[in-house]
């Protein structure tokens, strides 16, 4: 079988790699765009901290009606309000999903860092096994194990966190969960296929870089743009942001595109070692 050497220069000069990375970023962005919405809605939490010893002022700041003696009572009243609970629990779900993705990245780092996939692929190729056999015996089991780890951690977080599904509007919770499951599938496919098509450590760096960008970008946008003033002027409406149904649809499409493109790149590579 012919041998193709992939150097850092050749990889960074390949437009297909950037296209694959752009698809991953799009999946992350559309799936976690609610972080910007959530952070905007909770932009006043820092101000609330100043009224920690004055529950009445904190309640007015949070838009909660009633008489309260402690901040715990204010917080419970805020969370129990159906109009607001959805955003609180969505933030919990997003943070739990990010923790689950971190476990998947750590698992991938251990697998790739030890060279398990590369050594095993080389052995199969030397024995005359075809590329489909390599994918069937190595890549697909790896992708499955990584997904199970991520989804399992998410299920564990859901089991231990105080998430009350009944506080979500009808259909909101399952669509949010579906969106995250699709995003984790896109991320796993990106890492696995890119590790085979290009280089494992490049895939790890791109994956971590994309995750870091998604985590930092909403906060940077929120600090750079006067969202409060724009909203008061009617120029920015958080209600115009994509909802869970739209984000799930976009994430599904991006997942499919990323998987197909990644598979095409990996199958075109002449050397998997």
What is each residue range found by the language model?
Residues 1-24, 196:
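Aromatic- and glycine-rich beta-strand/loop motifs that create alpha-glucan
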Residues 7-10, 254-273:
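Junction motif at the cytosolic side of a transmembrane helix
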Residues 21-118, 135-212, 236-252:
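Secretory targeting signals
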Residues 34-37, 214-225:
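Juxtamembrane membrane-interface segments at transmembrane alpha-helix termini
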Residues 111, 122-125, 266:
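Helix-loop junctions at the membrane interface of multi-pass solute transporters
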Residues 124-132:
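Short helix-to-coil transition segments within interhelical loops
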Residues 222-239:
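Short hydrophobic, aromatic-rich alpha-helical segments embedded in or entering the lipid bilayer
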